[in-house]
Swiss-Prot record:
In-chain residues carrying the UniProt-annotated modification O-UMP-tyrosine: 61
Primary gene name: glnK1
Family annotation (Gene3D superfamilies): 3.30.70.120
One biological process term in Gene Ontology: regulation of nitrogen utilization
Protein name (database record): Nitrogen regulatory protein GlnK1
GO molecular function, one term: ATP binding
Function: Involved in the regulation of nitrogen metabolism. Regulates the activity of its targets by protein-protein interaction in response to the nitrogen status of the cell. Increases the activity of the glutamine synthetase 3 in the presence of 2-oxoglutarate. May regulate the activity of the ammonia channel Amt1 via direct interaction.
């Protein structure tokens, strides 16, 4: 991804929704590009994946929300495009449900422990 596409000036939040079983691969890939700091949240949602139908104890049910992992990585010194490329490559299976990646501008940051602000806080 080019720097122009990611608006690579300032602090960026790269947020990705991926398959839970790809988390270890993504963490490794992020560390390799110099972005080891991240926040991980278990989430459920629905994209283009179809709902799954099943039966349990004779009752039919539909699972229309799929378990995913949300990764948030704030970067300032590393191009957001490098982070996006690392996540996309590590999370890719080629199947529906691989996930999505979003890049958002961050207006500011403060490191609570030191009081640093802006890029140094990241």
């Amino acid at each position: 991804m080019s720097e122009t596409e990611t608006g690579n000036d300032g602090i960026k939040l790269v947020m990705a929704i991926i398959r839970p079983d790809k988390l270890a691969d993504v963490k490794t890939a992020l560390a390799e590009v110099g972005a080891p700091s991240l926040t991980v949240t278990n989430v459920s949602g629905r994209g283009s994946q179809p709902a799954k139908k099943g039966q349990w104890r004779g009752e039919e049910y539909t699972v229309d929300l799929h378990q995913k992992v949300k990764i948030e990585c704030v970067v300032a010194d590393i191009p957001a495009g490098d982070v996006v490329d690392a996540i996309a490559e590590a999370a890719h299976t080629g199947e529906k449900g691989d996930g999505k990646i979003f890049i958002l501008p961050v207006e500011g940051a403060v490191q609570v422990r030191t009081g640093k602000e802006g890029s140094p806080a990241v």
